Swiss-Prot record:
PANTHER family cross-referenced by the UniProt entry: FERROCHELATASE, FERROCHELATASE, MITOCHONDRIAL
Biological or metabolic pathway of the protein: Porphyrin-containing compound metabolism; protoheme biosynthesis; protoheme from protoporphyrin-IX: step 1/1
Transit peptide as recorded in UniProt: 1-83
UniProt gene name: FC2
Name by which UniProt lists this protein: Ferrochelatase-2, chloroplastic
Length: 512
């Protein structure tokens, strides 16, 4: 694959006569260009040494965030302007000939066979960033994960069986890594690219061991999640923090982390290209509602833990629609969240509810865009392509389309390569020409500080007390829920420790 240069956007074949239908039905939340999220303001206050407010022409206009972190954990570089960057790269000490550069791609992982499904689910639910228990009950994390994984495995196996018996995520991520390696070499960066999965092989620990064996001296950590969330990039980075703290070799390694990259021009243009291409397959492209479906997270992650995911997702959709608008594509669009698990409230609107409501409003043409996924896996191939498509057709939507995940799309891979080059601690003569394009960076060990800063100015006054119609406060309901959870956990502990009980009788838990 040849890394493409950034080119002008293709002209749109879509008519703008349907612009009167924008924004979409008011019952769904609509993103407006003037509703800038507080995350943008918060990022300017991050207390790291290296900080630059750049107006990159590779980050899109007013949405660009300033550099917000140390570039090297052991030797941070103060940057105040592009002239300083130019001075730094002209120095003879930037990247030496004996430097060994590595790129670590982080992703979720997925079961490759049906036998892998239950242990994969166990690894997933054993992660405290996925199921957040109070500290005093964290000893129940693994028993609870065992219970949930065993209970959910049969249905999950059906889903994986319907897409070929396993997840294609590893194969696709390996292909992305190889294309990224080739692209970096074309950009005169002789880097090795590694894949570390959070919940299945090759695990992050395996990738780190290979990095050490290869003698890597400069490492760029790149989560394959465009938007940052506690439960995705955050979980992977916390694991890396633990690994780095326990290893002297890693502690002394210069490394850079790119926590999110949804604002990059290449990524935005690549997404817009895919959307434009799929719109062209409809009989009336300008009458299609663009339906962005993102993986959801519990609402408490955003409101209580300070997760910036919702703000970054909404801004990402804004950026893509602005790019499409430049191409005279002015379709209606909306954003919803999928893959909700359990009884707690997640980010809304839920994808299934939003699809149903659009059908009731008379929408006949719908184009689904898996906005938070860069690889095909069960949530695109089964949840969107099968479940949501079937729901859409039942709801009255006549024409359904789905934008493919980015995969190894050349512009996307080239932009990732540029992100790596631009984030190297000392770029040197190997860099591409445009060095002002710098995404937001944090060193390992800064995940908590990052989240704290996002949350620092969110609310100065406590929210008003919400009273449910039956007379209890939301806080009381929360504590009632916690009490019920503790009762369930106590029963689960008894089941696990004694090997007896109704869960064993029903075959949900294996007998000892």
């Amino acid at each position: 694959m040849n890394c493409p240069a950034m080119t002008a956007s293709p002209s749109s074949s879509s008519s703008s006569s349907y612009s009167t239908f924008r924004p979409p039905p008011p019952l769904l939340p609509q993103l407006s260009n003037d509703s800038q999220r507080s995350v943008v303001m918060h990022c300017t206050r991050l207390p790291f040494e290296a900080f630059a407010a750049t107006s990159s022409n590779r980050l899109l206009g007013k949405h660009s965030l300033p550099l917000r972190a140390a570039l090297v954990t052991s030797n941070p570089l103060n940057i105040s302007s592009s002239s300083v960057i130019s001075d730094a790269i002209s120095s003879s000490s930037v990247i030496t000939d004996d430097a060994k550069i590595g790129v670590l791609l982080l992703n979720l992982g997925g079961p490759e066979t049906l036998d892998d499904v239950q242990p994969f689910l166990f690894n997933l639910f054993a992660d405290p960033d996925i199921i957040r228990l109070p500290p005093v009950f964290q000893f129940l994390q693994k028993p609870l994960a065992q219970f949930i994984s065993v209970a959910r495995a049969p249905k999950s196996k059906e889903g994986y069986a319907s897409i070929g018996g396993g997840s294609p995520l590893r194969h696709i991520t390996d292909a992305q890594a190889e294309e990224l390696r080739k692209c970096l070499w074309e950009k005169n960066v002789p880097a090795k690219v590694y894949v570390g999965m959070r919940y299945w092989h090759p695990f992050t620990e395996e990738a780190i061991e290979q990095i050490k064996r290869d003698g890597i001296t400069k490492l760029v950590v790149l989560p394959l999640y465009p938007q940052f969330s506690i439960s995705t990039s955050g979980s992977s980075l916390r694991l890396l923090e633990r690994i780095f703290r326990e290893d002297e070799y890693l502690v002394n390694m210069q490394h850079t982390v790119i926590p999110s990259w949804y604002q990059r021009e290449g990524y935005i243009k690549a997404m817009a290209n895919l959307i434009q291409s799929e719109l062209g397959k409809f009989g009336s492209p300008n009458q299609v509602v663009i339906f962005f479906s993102a993986h959801g997270v519990p609402l408490a992650y955003v409101e209580e833990a300070g997760d910036p995911y919702k703000a970054e997702m909404e801004e990402c959709v804004d950026l893509i629609m602005e790019e499409l608008d430049k191409r005279k594509i002015t379709n209606a669009y909306t954003l919803a969240y999928q893959s909700r698990v359990g009884p707690v409230e997640w980010l809304k609107p839920y994808t299934e509810e939003a699809i149903t409501e659009l059908g009731k409003k008379g929408v006949e043409n719908l184009l689904a865009v898996p906005i938070s996924f860069v690889s095909e896996h069960i949530e695109t191939l089964e949840e969107i392509d099968v479940e949501y498509k079937e729901l859409a057709l039942k709801s009255g939507i006549k024409n359904w389309g789905r934008v493919p995940a980015l995969g190894t799309e050349p512009m996307f891979i080239s932009d990732l390569a540029d992100a790596v080059v631009e984030s190297l601690p000392y770029v040197g003569a190997m860099a591409v020409s445009n060095l002002e394009a710098r995404q937001s960076l944090v060193p390992l060990g800064s995940v908590e500080e990052l989240l704290a800063t996002y949350d620092s100015q969110r609310r100065e006054l406590p929210a008003p007390v919400t009273m449910w119609e039956w007379g209890w406060t939301k806080s009381a309901e929360t504590w009632n829920g916690r009490a019920a959870m503790l009762a369930v956990l106590a029963l689960l502990v008894l089941e696990v420790t004694t090997g007896k009980g109704f869960l064993h009788q029903w075959g949900i838990l294996p007998s000892l």
